[in-house]
Amino acid sequence: MHYQPKAIETLRSPLNLTISAIALLTGSCTTPEPNLNILIGAQPTASAIATNKAINKELTPTSFKKVTVVKDLERPWGMAWLPDGAILITERVGRVKILRNGSLEKIAIANIPNIFISGQAGLMDISLHPRFDQNSLVYLTYSSGNFQSNHTSILRAKFDGKALVEPQVIFEVKPSKSGNQHFGSRIVWLPDETMLIAIGDGGNPPLELNGELIRKQAQKLDSQLGKVLRLKDDGSIPSDNPFVKNTSANPAIWSYGHRNIQGLFADPLSQQVWATEHGARGGDELNLIEAGKNYGWPAVSFSQEYTGGKVSKETSRPDIVDPKLVWTPSIAPSGLMLYRGDRFPDWRGNLFAGALVSKEVVRIKIEANKTVIQETIPIGQRVRDVRQGKDGFIYILTDEQAGQLIRLEPM
């Protein structure tokens, strides 16, 4: 059965914040900097003009505390909960660790074939099979190869309680690329037990592939770069993917026109798939991902080049899906989840996006009238991932040389 998301649900939980008004999209851009304001704005349109005028609306703050659970994680990237409540955590340098009963230990991995660790490259996301309690399968994304030729790979292994055994590479992204940027790499599962994998566009200018800027791969349907891919749990391609019958397109593609998605969440209740995506200088995006749709990069974008000037003359087009939210200046979003727990009743149904540059978690509420309201939760470290734990608390991984696992708890 072809997977189709439901329509956007109404989020009715009250927002307990102080808020200020801002239009969501802007044609200007500055060097990325922290933005610790709380923002409200209309549904994105190409003509929106940014403002910072407070509307003097006061609401009671939600009280919470930040608890440091673990310190000294080396560049942690992803996390996944085992049925017993233990947490598997990846470190980009090639390690998997387990936090169990307050103790952090390294997990042995039989082999990660040809792993490439440099810049943004290395061991990245981790996810459990939906039927992990029956098959013990764990999925890892990582960069393989070397600086001259590399790609994102998906490794599947079994967790025997102490080690990851029987590793098997079930998928390698094509074409190969050079450099050490834009691997994407988040994994989420759909209700039919197929998985979506976010793949980056390959890197920034002047990096090229086949004589043109590599980022143009995001618009090419014969390339897996700059895409969200949909695969079966063995790495094979579902027969109902949107481009399977297009002989000039790659059949693994689910959506395209992406720069570098590092936040991806599939909500089993609404059956919606949300993604946060890095822009260049500004133009970070929150998108609702749908099968077969084009999200614009680099043909349509609010980003500016790092060297100056606009990436694209267009910020909207009829054949391109508009983002639900755009951040300028950049927050560098990474990690995304939609809260469905009971610990924070007022936050239920809200999205939470990690932010590397602004070193915060952004709480996002989309109201019935399509107004988007944001609260920023300062963390003070680069936020790589944010997840809801099995206990209903919110967990945050910080991307530092001495990274931390932080838990948000109500007071």
Per-segment meaning from a language model:
Residues 1-11:
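N-terminal secretory signal peptides that target proteins for export/translocation
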Residues 26-28:
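C-terminal motif of bacterial Sec signal peptides marking the signal peptidase cleavage site
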Residues 30-203, 263-266, 272-279, 329-369, ...:
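Acidic, Gly/Ser/Thr-rich repeat motifs that build Ca2+-stabilized beta-propeller blades
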Residues 108-121, 167-183, 224, 231-254, ...:
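Surface-exposed loop and turn segments in beta-propeller and other repeat-based domains
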Residues 151, 214-218, 225, 283, ...:
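A detector of repeated loop/turn-to-beta-strand junctions in beta-rich toroidal repeat architectures
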Residues 152-162, 216-233, 289-290:
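Beta-propeller blade signature
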Residues 197-221, 283-285, 289:
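Short, conserved, GDST-rich strand-edge loop motifs in beta-rich repeat architectures
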Residues 258, 370-390:
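Conserved blade-ending motifs and adjacent loop-strand segments that build the rim/top face
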